[in-house]
Amino acid sequence: GSDGFFVAGRKAGIVLVTGSLTATFIGSSVVIGMVGIGYSMGLPGVWWLLVGAIGLVILGLFLAKKVRRVGVYTLPELLEKQYGSNAKLLASLVIVASWIAICAAQILAAGNVLHALISSWDIRALMVICAAVFVIYTVLGGQYSIIRTDFLQLIILVVGLLVTLGLVMNDVGGIRGLKDSLSQGFFSFPVSESFGWYNLVVFLILTGSVYVVGPDIYSRLFCARDERVARNSAFSAALAAIPIAFIVVLIGMGARALFPSISPSDQVFPTIIQQ
């Protein structure tokens, strides 16, 4: 039925919902982007995900239980119940327009990662394959297929990031070698000369707010077994974001020590994979 396809039967437990939430905001484009930020500015780059963790805590404290309680399928439906059909239409148009770009970025990032591994293939062909895989498992399995695939992708991603970090740190000479190779500004936290309090506030407003009202986030909460699972999953995903943020940025910092002249920054992660 519709519940099964759109919201996984509203039966997902905290492990699946947390895993799916985390995989949702730790996609290939975020990893590539954050590695590049770590390469460019160092530790302050973790705020790209840490503001998301703050947003998820706000979501868990004030909204997650209410969102799950309504029992709708989409964010526009939720807005319609609160503000009428005009709000639903406007939200639908905004989501479609913005998510064309977001999906394109994810496909581009996935294609870049695969191209780093299979350089003999045309990158456009790899992007088409990635897009086809996304569409096929979504159409065939619905949301339950998505959240299970998200969970598997998260495990693979975290293992891959840990292995990559270990290899990079080994080549650099550990944290001590990293400190010897980079200027002190790379280790300045929470702010630095290149990333001040103003930048942090802008990050919090523009990026953190996405985690409070994002349709991709809400679609996972709609799948939760009950209100308690929805709330606790938001908290758990926020907690998971913290170590992942530091792992990804440290990879970027290690890459800066090993390959100081990579440009543009979105080529840092593919370069690491190729090496």
Task: Say what each PLM segment does.
Residues 9, 93-97, 149, 236-237:
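Hydrophobic alpha-helical segments of secondary membrane carriers
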Residues 21-30, 53-56, 96-104, 156-159, ...:
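Membrane-embedded alpha-helical segments of transport systems
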Residues 9-10, 16, 33-45, 80, ...:
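Loop-to-helix junctions at membrane interfaces in multi-pass transport proteins
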